[in-house]
C-alpha cells in the first residue's frame, strides 16, 4: 500500500491522457455517458484529446495531479475561475470540430445543451473545482483530501475569495471529503 507521504502532488502535463480520461470519467459517469452517447471509445478519446489540448474544459493546464512513486497518475483536481471557463469552452468546441465525425458532432450538439444546468456559473473572484478524482485501487488514504487542500492552497495564492465545488452528490467519497472540509452542499432541483 502506498502512503500519502510518498505521493507527489504537482501540476500536470499533456501526457497520461488515457489515465486522465479514466479518472475524469469517474467524476460524472452518467453525464459523460449521456453527453457522448453509447460509443465509449469516442467518449474516452474525447476526454483524452481534451486533456492534451492547451485549452478545453478538461485540459491538463487546469489540473493538479497526484503521482505515485512510479510516476503513475492516480488522482487529479481540475478547476478554474469564470474567466478561464470561456476559453475552456471554446477549446472544447475546437477539439470537437477537429476530432469528432459529423454524426458525433450532431449528437453532441443535441446532448450538450441539455447539460448546461450541471455547470453552474462560477462567481467572480472564486475558484471552482469541477473534477476531483482518485483511483480507489491505488489505496492511498486521504488522497482526495490532499488534492482538495491543493485547490484551496492554489486559490489562496491567487487571491480568490472562495472555492466552489462542482460535483455530483452520488459519489460517496466526495460527500465524505466535503463533510471533512466543512463544505455544505447546495441543492438544486431540476425540472423533469
Language-model features, listed with the residues they occupy:
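Conserved GNAT acetyl-CoA-binding A-motif
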Residues: 125-127, 155-168
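Conserved acyl-donor/pantetheine-binding loop and adjacent beta-alpha core of acyl/acetyltransferases
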Residues: 83-126
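Conserved acetyl-CoA-binding loop-helix of GNAT-fold acetyltransferases
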Residues: 140-153, 178-179
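Active-site rim helix/loop that mediates acceptor-substrate recognition in acyltransferases
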Residues: 40-63, 68-69, 116-118
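A short beta-loop-alpha structural element at the N-terminal edge
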Residues: 8-22, 31-34, 82
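Conserved GNAT-fold acetyl-CoA-binding loop/helix
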Residues: 28-51, 92, 96-101
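Conserved catalytic-core motifs of GNAT/GCN5-like acyltransferases
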Residues: 164-166, 178, 183-192
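Conserved beta-strand in the GNAT
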Residues: 65, 72-81, 128, 133
Amino acid at each position: 500500500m502506498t502512503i500519502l507521504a510518498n505521493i507527489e502532488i504537482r501540476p500536470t502535463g499533456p501526457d497520461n491522457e488515457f489515465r486522465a480520461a479514466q479518472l475524469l470519467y469517474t467524476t460524472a459517469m452518467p453525464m459523460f455517458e449521456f453527453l457522448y452517447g453509447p460509443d465509449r471509445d469516442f467518449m474516452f478519446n474525447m476526454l483524452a484529446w481534451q486533456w492534451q489540448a492547451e485549452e478545453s474544459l478538461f485540459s491538463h493546464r487546469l489540473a493538479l495531479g497526484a503521482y505515485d512513486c512510479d510516476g503513475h497518475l492516480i488522482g487529479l483536481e481540475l478547476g478554474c475561475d469564470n474567466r478561464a471557463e470561456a476559453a475552456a469552452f471554446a477549446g472544447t468546441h475546437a477539439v470537437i470540430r477537429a476530432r469528432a465525425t459529423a454524426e458525433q458532432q450532431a449528437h453532441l450538439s443535441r446532448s450538450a445543451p441539455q447539460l448546461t444546468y450541471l455547470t453552474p456559473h462560477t462567481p467572480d473572484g472564486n475558484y471552482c473545482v469541477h473534477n476531483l478524482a482518485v483511483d480507489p485501487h491505488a489505496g492511498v488514504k486521504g488522497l482526495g483530501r490532499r488534492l482538495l487542500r491543493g485547490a484551496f492552497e492554489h486559490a489562496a495564492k491567487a487571491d480568490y475569495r472562495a472555492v466552489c465545488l462542482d460535483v455530483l452528490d452520488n459519489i460517496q467519497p466526495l460527500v465524505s471529503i466535503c463533510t471533512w472540509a466543512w463544505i455544505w452542499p447546495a441543492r438544486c432541483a431540476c425540472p423533469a
